[in-house]
Structures are given as structure tokens and as C-alpha cells.
Amino acid sequence: MSKRKVAIIGSGNIGTDLMIKILRHGQHLEMAVMVGIDPQSDGLARARRMGVATTHEGVIGLMNMPEFADIDIVFDATSAGAHVKNDAALREAKPDIRLIDLTPAAIGPYCVPVVNLEENVDQLNVNMVTCGGQATIPMVAAVSRVARVHYAEIIASIASKSAGPGTRANIDEFTETTSRAIEVVGGAAKGKAIIVLNPAEPPLMMRDTVYVLSDEASQDDIEASINEMAEAVQAYVPGYRLKQRVQFEVIPQDKPVNLPGVGQFSGLKTAVWLEVEGAAHYLPAYAGNLDIMTSSALATAEKMAQSLARKAGEAA
């Protein structure tokens, strides 16, 4: 099966790590172009050393390159505002081009590979939510497939050193996009997301806490569902793991809790603690927040490439 050529817009931490993943592990993908706006960026320099074509003139530079004619999939690792413009420009030049959005822009549907990749594999633009979303939404979905989830809250704690300028500029978008995806993909009636930039030295690995309030159900069934989901995520993010056993608390009907925006709640509270260790391809191992984004994007693109190859075979 021939490989599909891809380009990455954004030569920062995420874009560079993704490039290295594709070069080392791409099964149906061929790394063709790295796009940046800073001619002195380490990402562009590294791409050139690895034999990848580059441009420092942004998406316009990409579209002016001869390689653009063969590009099937573009990863956008810029910012939410830039992605809206990039999508419009690329779509005008190539209406059928596939975009994988690693910003919080969310022009296309949210995609969390282990939960809903199959139903989004033929979309022209998919959004990878956020690092916190990729880590925690599978846990919310794991509870949702056992019991009705009324409320889910996630706290993503990441090393301050792993948060580049793009992440810092998109904090509000992070919380909004993650909260919405907890509902749309995770299945919660109401979602809330909090991000913490941890300044500790030496930097700590990404840690995530997930609280889910659901109808009462078998705790064994919920724990089994969560463990099964964690194993499924590990298939493409090997450093993803439960930090300890799942904890439960029954909230009785005669002692309900009041949830802002939800009201009185009684039922089952499920608490999940996660840790995500990065693969250290380009970024340090503590930057699991960035690794889970690039790994999820890679898994999505691989499926898209297979789908495109099948369609090309059927049309031949």
C-alpha cells in the first residue's frame, strides 16, 4: 500500500515531535513538508537535517511548493486563530485535502481515537481536542458506556516547561474546547475542564484527575470498563496509565450534592487518577501532554491514510 504524503504546519514543540514520530513510525504516512514562520526555528532546522522539505513562509509558502500537489493530509499545530485561516486557504486550493487540527479551533468534529475515530475517519477536518481531553475523555466515555453521566470534571496538571507559547496563548480555548468535548465525545450531560501549569523543578509528568457523577451502576462494571479503555489508549500512547485504582463514592438520595449548572445530584461518584509519560522522541519524557496529542494525531492520520488508499483502490 503506497504511503500518503503529509505536511505539518507549525515547527514548534508539537510539530517537531510529530514529524519525528512520522519519520520513525509512519506506516501509511510519508513526511513531505514542514511549515513554519520563523526561519531560525529549531523545528525547521531539524527537518532540513532529516531530509524533509521546508518553508518558513507559512501556509502560503506550502501552497507555492511543488510538493503541495501530492499532499493528502495536513497537520496544523499552530494556534486556534491561525487554524481558521489555514483551513480556509488550503480548502480553496484543494477542496478535498484532509486537515488534522491540533489547536482548540474545532472547525471539524472532535476526535479522540479510542472513542470515535471510526465515525470520523472520512471527515475533511477533525479536531484533536486538547492534551487534557485526549487523556481524560476516554475515562468519561468508559463510565458513559456503563451508566448515564450527569457531570464530569477533569483537572489536567502539566509541567510549566512543557507549555510553549501556543499552549499559553490558548488557555481559555483549552478549557472551553475540553469542556465541550467531555460532553460531545465523553457523553457527559455537563463537562468542566481545568488546566494547571505546574512550575515544579525538576518538571513533573502530566497528571490528570477525572471526577464523574453518574447514575448508580455496578462498580465492578465501571472499573472493568475504565481498565479496558486505558489499555486501548496504551496501544497508541504507551506511557498512558492509571496512577492508582479507581475510587468510588455513593452519594445517597437523602444527602445530595448541589452542582452549579446541574442542580441536585445523587448517585455514584467515580474518581480516576492518570499519569502520562512521553515517549521522548523530541520532547522530554515529562511532556506527556504534548506526546499524547502527537500520538493521537498520528493514530488518526494512519486511519485516514488507510481509508484514502481503500477509496483509491475502489475507484481504480
Curated annotation (Swiss-Prot):
**Its domain of life?**
Bacteria
Return the InterPro entries for the record: Acetaldehyde_dehydrogenase, Acetylaldehyde_DH_C, NAD(P)-bd_dom_sf, Semialdehyde_DH_NAD-bd
Name the Gene3D superfamilies on file: Dihydrodipicolinate Reductase, domain 2, NAD(P)-binding Rossmann-like Domain
The enzyme's first-digit EC class, named in words, is oxidoreductase
SUPFAM superfamilies registered for this protein in UniProt: Glyceraldehyde-3-phosphate dehydrogenase-like, C-terminal domain, NAD(P)-binding Rossmann-fold domains
Task: State the Gene Ontology BP annotations.
Answer: 3-phenylpropionate catabolic process
EC number assigned by the record: 1.2.1.10
Q: Which HAMAP family match?
A: Ac_ald_DH_ac
- Give the family per the record: Belongs to the acetaldehyde dehydrogenase family.
Can you say what this protein is called?
A: Acetaldehyde dehydrogenase
- Record the organism: Escherichia coli O17:K52:H18 (strain UMN026 / ExPEC)
Gene transcribed to yield this protein: mhpF
